[in-house]
C-alpha cells in the first residue's frame, strides 16, 4: 500500500496559487510548488499527471476569486459602478492574477478577457437595464463601451503601477458612464454603430456655439 499523501489536492492547488499571485503562472513548476509546501515533488504527482493540470486548477481558482469580486460589486447601491470599482481593485490588489485572466492569450476559446467580459456582462445586464432604463441591446452596448474604459484603466494599473488613485478612476468611470448613457439615449445610430458623424458633430458644435 502506498504511503498516505501528506498534503491534499486542495493544499497543492493553493500553494501553486500563491506562487501565481506573486510571480505569475509561468513560475508554477513542480520544484517551486514542492518548495512552497516544504516537500519533494512526489506528492504533487500523486494527484496530477502533469504541471499543466495544476495550472488549469490555478486558472479556475483565479476565476473564482475574480467572480467573488464581481459578486461583491453587484451588492453596491449602484451595481454597475460597484462592478467597475471591484474590477479595478482586482487589478490593483491581484496584478498577477489579472495578467493571467485578462492579459494572457488563452489556450482555450472559453477563457481570456473576452470570455470574462461576456460572463460579467450577463451578470450585470439586468441591473444596467433597470438603473439606466435601457433595453437589453442598449445595456449590452453600454456595458461593452464601459468595459473598454475599465479594462484600459486596469491595464495601466497592472503595467504602470499607481498611475491614478481609486478616487480619480471612480470619477472617470462616472464621467464615461454619463457620456455613454447620453449617447445611447440621444445620438441616433449609436447603439448600431451607424452614427452620421458629420451631422452629429455639427449638431454638437452648433449647440456649443449657440450657447456662447
Where are each of the predicted segments found?
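Helix-turn-helix
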Residues: 11, 15, 19-53, 57
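Short hydrophobic clusters on alpha-helical segments that form packing/core surfaces
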Residues: 12-20, 62, 66, 87, ...
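Alpha-helical DNA-contacting segments of helix-turn-helix folds
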Residues: 20, 52-62, 101, 105, ...
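Amphipathic alpha-helical linker/stalk segments
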Residues: 56, 60-82, 115, 119-131
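Amphipathic alpha-helical segments that line or abut small-molecule/effector binding pockets
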Residues: 78-96, 140, 144, 174, ...
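Helical hydrophobic small-molecule/effector-binding pocket
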Residues: 81-103, 110-117, 147-151
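Amphipathic alpha-helical packing segments from all-alpha helical-bundle domains
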Residues: 107-133, 140-145, 171-182
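C-terminal peripheral helix-coil segments that are non-catalytic and often amphipathic
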Residues: 126-130, 163-212
Amino acid at each position: 500500500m502506498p504511503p498516505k499523501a501528506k498534503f491534499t489536492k486542495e493544499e497543492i492547488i493553493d500553494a501553486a496559487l500563491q506562487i501565481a499571485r506573486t510571480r505569475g503562472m509561468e513560475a508554477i513548476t513542480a520544484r517551486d510548488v514542492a518548495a512552497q509546501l516544504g516537500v519533494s515533488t512526489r506528492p504533487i504527482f500523486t494527484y496530477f499527471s502533469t504541471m499543466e493540470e495544476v495550472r488549469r486548477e490555478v486558472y479556475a481558482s483565479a476565476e473564482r476569486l475574480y467572480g467573488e469580486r464581481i459578486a461583491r460589486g453587484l451588492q453596491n447601491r449602484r451595481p454597475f459602478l460597484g462592478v467597475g470599482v471591484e474590477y479595478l481593485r482586482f487589478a490593483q490588489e491581484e496584478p498577477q492574477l489579472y495578467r493571467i485572466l485578462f492579459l494572457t492569450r488563452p489556450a482555450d476559446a472559453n477563457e481570456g478577457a473576452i470570455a470574462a467580459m461576456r460572463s460579467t456582462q450577463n451578470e450585470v445586464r439586468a441591473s444596467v437595464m433597470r438603473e439606466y432604463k435601457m433595453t437589453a441591446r442598449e445595456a449590452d452596448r453600454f456595458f461593452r463601451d464601459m468595459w473598454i474604459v475599465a479594462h484600459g484603466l486596469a491595464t495601466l494599473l497592472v503595467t504602470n503601477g499607481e498611475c491614478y488613485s481609486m478616487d480619480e478612476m471612480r470619477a472617470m468611470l462616472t464621467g464615461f458612464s454619463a457620456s455613454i448613457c447620453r449617447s445611447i439615449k440621444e445620438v441616433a445610430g449609436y447603439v448600431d454603430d451607424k452614427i452620421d458623424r458629420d451631422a452629429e458633430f455639427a449638431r454638437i458644435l452648433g449647440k456649443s456655439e449657440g450657447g456662447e
